[in-house]
Design a protein with these regions (language model features):
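Alpha/beta-hydrolase fold catalytic core
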Residues: 1-33, 55-57, 96-97
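Active-site loop/oxyanion-hole signature of alpha/beta-hydrolase fold enzymes
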Residues: 15-16, 23, 51-54, 61-102, ...
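Serine-hydrolase catalytic-loop signature spanning alpha/beta hydrolases and amidase-signature enzymes
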Residues: 38-48, 59
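Alpha/beta-hydrolase active-site loop signature
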Residues: 40, 64-68, 132
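Conserved catalytic-core motifs of eukaryotic protein kinase domains, centered on the activation segment
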Residues: 45-47, 70-76, 136-139
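Conserved hydrolase catalytic core segment
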Residues: 97-138
Length: 146
């Protein structure tokens, strides 16, 4: 019988004042992997992936601003730059350097933007399910659905 590993639920306050929630699957000292969910996701969206990776990596699954147990954005700032600053602040707060960044959908866009501005922080980048550009009609549809 296999024992299911449970992550530690933690929060970190960034210099910007926003509190971000994340799941830490342990294994300190192993290479760090930071997982970013999609628009309608949250840190637990990565539970199955995290369980598979946590034997060999320190897996951190972040609730991005406005999602899961993280704070809503101050003044409603959900810009790409704000997400990039959150990733930078989070990685600095946890002393992550040379980490692997994995992003799905919106998290993939944020990961790609982060890599473009802070590639020196990354060892690897994995992008899952993003398109080449943002179509305004898609943004309008998502806004209506939310």
């Amino acid at each position: 019988m296999t024992t299911k590993i449970k992550p530690e639920s933690k929060k970190v306050k960034l210099n910007s004042g926003i509190n971000l929630h994340y799941l830490d699957w342990g294994n300190r000292g192993a290479p760090d992997v930071l997982l970013l969910h999609g628009l309608r996701g949250h840190a637990h969206s990565w539970d199955d992936v995290s369980l598979a990776l946590c034997q060999d990596y320190r897996v951190l699954a972040l609730d991005q601003r406005g999602r899961g147990e993280s704070d809503w954005a101050p003044e409603g700032d959900y810009s790409g730059s704000a997400f990039v600053e959150d990733i930078l602040g989070f990685s600095d707060a946890l002393n992550l350097d040379g980490f692997t960044l994995v992003g799905h959908s919106m998290g993939g866009r944020n990961s790609l933007a982060f890599a473009g501005r802070h590639s020196e922080k990354l060892a690897k980048l994995c992008i899952v399910d993003i398109g080449p550009s943002v179509d305004p009609r898609g943004g309008q549809r998502i806004t209506q659905e939310l």
